[in-house]
């Protein structure tokens, strides 16, 4: 457990102020377990991320470089150093099918390397959330969970900028992207569980932290013991999927 505590402390280094009331009505206890990022000092800046794989015709792109910079701060140090993020699966580019998602990841030539994987989901209300996995998502024949303590869940939303602006500057964007990450708690080992009919991350007390169906049409999200997460979707515990992407980091 000491290693886990050290990891949680390292996640908190250099973080901005926690805006406990900015997203929903989460309790202070849940907020204290979550990790939020606003910006970092220039001395801590990593080389910029390069996104590879979007088609020129892809209109609904879920991931931006700004979001990548926030997400990479939660990843293991060796993964943070990678600058290339490669799109392996996109609902818009490859079709709405969990089988297609698994198939695209199955033939990833780097799936045996020390890389990471990010799943990004958008719901009908514009909420963007997902998870990070230390290994590729793949179905298992038996009820077997995989993944390790590097896995986490996350959600990202636009929140009000608390800095005071001149009243004449009302036309400028007064919102910032803010990430809330939910790291591995050590309470159980239910990081990732995938079958031919669903993909999930986190579990406990009969609920999944994140679960999506084989048609990539619907999903559910509940607080889980694995990650101590809040409900991830803006729609609530049950959500409709608008977009899904899976990226390889490294």
From Swiss-Prot:
BP GO terms, sorted: response to oxidative stress
Keyword Mitochondrion: yes
PROSITE patterns: TLDC
Example of a GO cellular component annotation carried by this entry: nucleus
Localization in the cell: Mitochondrion
TLDc domain location: 61-250
Name of the protein in its database record: Oxidation resistance protein 1
